[in-house]
Swiss-Prot record:
Phylogenetic placement of the source organism: Bacteria, Pseudomonadati, Pseudomonadota, Gammaproteobacteria, Pasteurellales
Name used for this protein in its record: Probable bacterial non-heme ferritin-like protein
Keywords annotated in UniProt: Cytoplasm, Iron, Iron storage, Metal-binding, Oxidoreductase
GO CC entries: cytoplasm; cytosol
GO biological process annotation, one example: iron ion transport
Localization (cell): Cytoplasm
Molecular function terms from GO: ferric iron binding; ferrous iron binding; ferroxidase activity
Residue stretches making up the Ferritin-like diiron domain: 1-145
Main location as per UniProt: cytoplasm
SUPFAM superfamilies: Ferritin-like
Binding, Fe cation 1: E17, E50, H53
Family: Belongs to the ferritin family. Prokaryotic subfamily.
Length: 165
């Protein structure tokens, strides 16, 4: 049985994953409007992955006899100055998710809820991969620059990444 504190944190995380899905889907719409079709596809695939993360938490809460509570989700920003701003925003958002997962893992360990602690290890590993991915995309963008050729190459690369996911 999960404690009230852990249930609240799991529900908060579930709703944050839901927001993440909406954020990446909205970013994909902006990218599509700007002609960054590869990035739009990549972010759309990533939005679906975030929804899977949300569903995993939803299922876990219900399987443990707790109630998964979906809250009102704030609308994400829909305007960006550049592709670089989109990528920087995704990277910063993933760092926020990591900090929230770490807080949740710490709380489960503190409360000696080893089942929840074990369940969350998947998210710990996933966040390591997410931060690494978005950091490397940002590094490439900084290296290639924001001129036409650099943006073309990044967009093409992200489009290729979306087919591997």
């Amino acid at each position: 049985m999960l404690s009230e504190n852990v249930v609240k944190l799991l529900n908060d995380q579930m709703n944050l994953e839901f927001y993440s899905s909406n954020l990446y889907l909205q970013m994909s719409a902006w990218c599509d409007q700007q002609g960054f079709e590869g990035t739009a596809k990549f972010l759309s695939v990533h939005a679906a992955e975030e929804m899977q993360h949300m569903r995993k938490l939803f299922t876990y809460l219900n399987e443990t006899g707790s109630l998964a509570v979906i809250s009102a989700i704030e609308a994400p920003a829909h305007e960006y100055k550049s592709l670089k701003e989109v990528i920087e925003t995704t990277y910063e958002h993933e760092k926020l998710i990591t900090s929230k997962i770490n807080e949740l893992v710490g709380k489960t360990f503190e409360e000696k809820d080893y089942s929840a602690f074990n369940f969350l290890q998947w998210y710990v590993e996933e966040q390591h991969e997410e931060e690494k991915l978005f950091s490397s995309i940002l590094d490439k963008l900084n290296f290639l620059g924001e001129d036409g050729k650099g943006l073309f190459l990044i967009d093409k690369d992200l489009g290729n990444l979306s087919t591997k996911a």
